[in-house]
């Protein structure tokens, strides 16, 4: 069956339908990872977006247990070629069946390099995936321009708290769309991790007397999370060590008077170099974000840049002055991607006093 990807600038790509045949409008973003497509599909940070995989052949090893949440989150999936015969001793099915099961539409057989070039040059834009051959551009384009993702954190956060038992330090993990490997990375280091819904009050979290607080990744515009920002102000005022990544990094900055802005096309992939400003050392990081903290709006008495992106000079991390708080824009837990920066979990544990 034919499928069509229609961009808000009027560009139309014609390909083959994969997964569900329902029609969707979403923000179109691209990911440059060569592997780890299942982790990408199950990353809650992609809620409200349709993902273009720039690597030309996707699905070679099928669906395996390597999932970062219980379900896939993108609105749509866009690939050059989808493997129809996955082969792996852990394979439990194909991407085609996985997308169909979860009612996610997609399109294959289009020039994803040309599509990515458009997004790089013109910036991230909205688009529609449809199987309707009688589509009307005059009707569709205004809808694409009007579409916004809104506050999607409420969609991806857990509904109730849950605990991963451990014998070491007690960590409160605020779930703004947390990938599984964040809690696993802490738990593997002995920590007992309590995962809290995004709108849990600071009073409830502090009342549990955690040794540290972790703020997770998540989707969307951080400025939409106004209620959460107010709670983070209270957590900042406490003496509890805090480690934040991705959306948590941005929300903590907003809670302390800094500003954020939307990037032209964001950072999404497993090969982004970041520089530690304290040592000069460069790490290859996994990233998935479309917003960034404006360092010019930082009060130097409150926070200072700790990491910077080598490619474009944007902020990749902050150290908070006089506080046991540090935040990063990238994913130290990887999945998918390199684990160069996984040592940051060890640093967080040392900040809490270390596991005995």
Spans of features found by a protein language model:
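RNA-binding accessory domains that recognize and position tRNA/RNA substrates
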Residues: 1-199, 203, 207-208, 222, ...
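Proline-centered loop/turn at the N-terminus of a beta-strand
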Residues: 105, 170, 241-243, 259, ...
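Active-site glycine-centered loops adjacent to acidic/histidine catalytic or metal-binding residues
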Residues: 111, 246, 289, 331
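Beta-strand-turn-beta hairpins that frame and shape the catalytic cleft
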Residues: 166-171, 279-282, 320-325
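Conserved hydrophobic/aromatic pocket- or pore-lining residues that grip, position, or stack substrates
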Residues: 175, 186, 213, 252, ...
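Cysteine-nucleophile active-site neighborhood
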Residues: 217-284, 292, 337-352
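Catalytic beta-strand/loop cores that center a nucleophilic Ser/Cys/Thr
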Residues: 281-322, 356
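A glycine-centered loop/beta-turn motif at secondary-structure junctions
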Residues: 317-356
């Amino acid at each position: 069956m034919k499928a069509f990807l229609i961009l808000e600038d009027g560009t139309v790509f014609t390909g083959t339908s994969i997964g569900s045949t329902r029609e969707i409008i979403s923000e179109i973003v691209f990911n440059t990872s060569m592997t780890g497509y299942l982790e990408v599909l199950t990353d809650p940070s992609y809620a409200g977006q349709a993902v273009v995989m720039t690597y030309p052949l996707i699905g070679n090893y099928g669906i395996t247990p390597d999932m970062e949440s219980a379900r896939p989150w993108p609105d749509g999936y866009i690939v050059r070629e989808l493997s129809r015969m996955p082969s792996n001793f852990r394979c439990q099915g194909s991407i085609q069946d996985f997308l169909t099961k979860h009612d996610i539409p997609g399109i294959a057989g289009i020039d994803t390099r040309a599509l990515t070039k458009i997004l790089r040059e013109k910036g991230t834009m909205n688009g529609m995936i449809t199987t309707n051959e009688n589509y009307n551009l005059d009707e569709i384009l205004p809808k694409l321009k009007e579409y916004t993702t809104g506050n999607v954190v409420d969609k991806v956060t857990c509904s109730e708290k849950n605990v991963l038992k451990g014998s070491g330090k007690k960590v409160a993990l605020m779930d703004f769309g947390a990938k599984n490997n964040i809690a696993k990375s802490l738990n593997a280091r002995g920590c007992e991790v309590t995962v809290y819904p995004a709108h849990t009050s600071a009073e409830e979290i502090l009342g549990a007397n955690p040794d540290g607080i972790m703020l997770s990744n998540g989707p969307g515009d951080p400025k939409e999370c106004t209620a959460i920002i107010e709670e983070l102000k209270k957590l900042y005022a406490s003496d509890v060590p805090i480690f934040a990544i991705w959306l948590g990094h941005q929300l903590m900055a907003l809670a302390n008077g800094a500003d954020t802005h939307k990037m032209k096309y964001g950072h999404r992939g497993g090969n982004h170099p970041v520089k530690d400003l304290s040592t000069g050392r460069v790490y290859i990081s996994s990233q998935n974000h479309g917003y960034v903290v404006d360092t010019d709006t930082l009060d130097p008495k409150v926070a200072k840049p700790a990491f910077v992106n080598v490619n474009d000079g944007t902020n990749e991390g902050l150290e908070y002055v006089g506080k046991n708080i540090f935040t990063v824009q990238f994913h130290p837990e990887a999945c998918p991607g390199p684990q160069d920066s996984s040592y940051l979990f060890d640093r967080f544990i040392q900040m809490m006093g270390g596991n005995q």
